[in-house]
Amino acid sequence: AEGKAAGPLDKLKGSTLDKDLLHDVSGSVNPGSVLAILGPSGAGKTTLLNMLTLEKKGGVPQGHIRVDGAPFTLHKYNETAASVEQFDTLWASLTVKDHLVHAVRLYQPQLDAAARDAAIQDLIKSVGLEDQQDVKAGNEFMRGLSGGNKRRLSIAVALAKRPSVLFLDEPTSGVDSASAVMIMSFLKKIAEARSIIIVCTIHQPPASVFAGFDNCMVLSMGRVAYFGKADSMGEYFASIGNTPPPDTNIAEFVLDLVNTDFTPE
């Protein structure tokens, strides 16, 4: 359904010269919510995310993407969306605050000094880096932020753009389980507080991370095996004869299921 301010996808397809990579992928996302795109390796998660972010790779796109009912063009993307890549692209020698000073100056040049400082502190607070704001990002040669805090900083830099839609590629990849839970927790809070759409790909979420999703789309061989409320996924698969065992990780159960049993009809 195309509700106001929803981000609908209508029968998206992606193809190369050899084969179709996605088949009639449809759905919608509302502001203030987090959509997780799940699927085993090769299911089409990266291809779908590339299409949503208008990346010209992974084949020839077909279909429609709309935001607020309007076509999601490159101009619209630059105006309303931001992306966070799987691997952080930070300046090792700059502090958390330095990164956000540059980001706010770039994306919000109209702000005066006082408003700019307030925006920077709001971003730092929104990702929980208040006590790390003077720490350098660091790298393998320079001590700095932990992997989880680097991911938080990358998200804060993207939020400086004040997007209506935020895309993230594997935001919990490469961080420990505690950091993964915290990242998904504050993403959910950010979506609600700023009334933005957050769409992320996730490979194999533990139950504690899965609990942070509002909605999820499960892909298998480029097709949608499930799209709906995350907390209704187990019930749906039970209704079609695949009842999850008690106390199981629903995401893990479903990913194992679609990896071996889901076939297109």
Give the location of each predicted region.
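Conserved ABC transporter NBD signature motif
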Residues: 27-30, 53-54, 60-79, 140
